[in-house]
């Protein structure tokens, strides 16, 4: 009887999966058993994207690229004296009227008569101040060479495009209060400074006023208008974007065929190549989760 008890082995303590508590008797420090990976989850938070949806979302980027390209085309034609002051002022009035019309049609619940009147008063003050400051803008960079002006202008436009909010997350609804983030502020300021540099190379005060008014209308007002169109009807947003692409490509082709090929390649890269590349990269995305992950807060600490 005693010999049988002596022959039986006494089982050791069972291994426990604990993060703290020191070494467990009978097991190495790096020991794991079969139950260690039972709670592992693979690709739990990976979002599987559809190619067509990604291509539709990328249209917003091409749309704004076309808007900036059209602004540059207006600058070029103005510097070459192809557009006079009266044509520019007529273009400014047309853009302002069409922008307000789109806002009235897409945001009729947000826009009231008092808010519209307040906008008109602010625009009148803004336009008056811009006209008064036009002579200062005209002579602001007289002592700087034109090559330096064009180099800085191109750099500022690239910075504007790089930091621009293409998702529309920083755009506020009409009448709403929303603090913009740092990158969107830098993007807008870069576009304004680029407009001032271009306007400083124009021959007359009225030219400067018309170009500055056009540029500021587009850079400050166009993102809100395009965002309202997209929120109102996505199909209308696609139709407007493709029409804008066609107009831009036609205008660039009439100006220079090499620039047309470059811009067409850029549009295809943004709308076709990059979405396809993103979908292909999803195949190699691998994420594992388990009890070893750091704890995450499930509430907003700002509340």
From Swiss-Prot:
Locations listed in the record: Endoplasmic reticulum membrane
TM ranges: 59-79, 87-107, 120-140, 143-163, 179-199, 209-229, 234-254, 259-279
EC annotation from Swiss-Prot or TrEMBL: 2.4.1.198
One protein family per Pfam: GPI2
Pathway: Glycolipid biosynthesis; glycosylphosphatidylinositol-anchor biosynthesis
Main EC class the enzyme belongs to: transferase
Reactions that this protein is recorded to catalyse: a 1,2-diacyl-sn-glycero-3-phospho-(1D-myo-inositol) + UDP-N-acetyl-alpha-D-glucosamine = a 6-(N-acetyl-alpha-D-glucosaminyl)-1-(1,2-diacyl-sn-glycero-3-phospho)-1D-myo-inositol + UDP + H(+)
Protein name in UniProt: Phosphatidylinositol N-acetylglucosaminyltransferase subunit C
Origin species: Arabidopsis thaliana (Mouse-ear cress)
Name of the gene: PIGC
């Amino acid at each position: 009887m005693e010999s049988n008890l002596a022959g039986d082995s006494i089982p050791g303590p069972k291994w426990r999966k604990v993060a703290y508590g020191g070494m467990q008797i009978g097991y190495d420090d790096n020991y794991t058993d079969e139950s260690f990976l039972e709670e592992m989850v693979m690709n739990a938070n990976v979002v599987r994207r559809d190619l067509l949806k990604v291509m539709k979302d990328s249209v917003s980027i091409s749309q704004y690229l076309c808007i900036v390209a059209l602004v540059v085309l207006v600058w070029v034609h103005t510097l070459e004296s192809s557009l006079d002051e009266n044509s520019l002022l007529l273009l400014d009035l047309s853009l302002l009227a069409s922008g307000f019309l789109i806002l009235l049609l897409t945001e009729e619940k947000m826009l009231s008569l008092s808010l519209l009147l307040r906008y008109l008063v602010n625009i009148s003050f803004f336009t008056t101040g811009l006209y008064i400051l036009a002579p200062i803008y005209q002579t602001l960079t007289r002592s700087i060479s034109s090559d330096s002006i064009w180099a800085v202008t191109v750099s500022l436009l690239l910075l504007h495009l790089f930091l621009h909010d293409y998702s529309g997350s920083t755009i506020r609804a009409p009448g709403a209060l929303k603090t913009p983030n740092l990158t969107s502020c830098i993007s807008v300021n870069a576009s304004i400074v680029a407009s001032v540099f271009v306007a400083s190379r124009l021959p007359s005060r009225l030219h400067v006023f018309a170009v500055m008014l056009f540029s500021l209308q587009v850079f400050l007002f166009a993102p809100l208008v395009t965002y309202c169109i997209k929120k109102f009807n996505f199909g209308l947003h696609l139709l407007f974007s493709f029409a804008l692409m066609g107009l831009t490509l036609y205008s660039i082709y009439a100006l220079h065929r090499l620039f047309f090929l470059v811009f067409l390649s850029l549009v295809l890269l943004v709308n076709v190549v990059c979405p396809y590349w993103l979908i292909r990269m999803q195949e190699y995305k691998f994420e594992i989760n388990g009890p070893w992950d750091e704890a995450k807060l499930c509430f907003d600490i700002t509340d």
